[in-house]
From Swiss-Prot:
Belongs to the UPF0145 family. It comes from the Bacteria. This is UPF0145 protein BLi01945/BL05168.
Amino acid sequence: MIIVTTDTIANQNIVEVKGLVTSSIVQSRNIGKDILSGLKSVIGGELKNYTQMLEDSKKAVRERLVNQAEELGANAIVGLRFELSAGQGTSELIGYGTAVVIG
């Protein structure tokens, strides 16, 4: 499955648009890790626990998008976008794109 953030794929023709694919994941944050991350944010530096949580979320959302696209009979996703929102103790990652057939 080819996945791109652009609306076209270089050297490929989109022969059919199958439709929108969307997925989201909501995760709660760990209080213990929040305390350690709070200290780290005061000192400065990467919040590795949150970075890993975000990477895991992106992977899960991508897998779900691929499954949806395959169910529609697509072999590619164009225009992939991610949106992240954080709330009180949670974060939500939404991914969406257009499932297409390239040939």
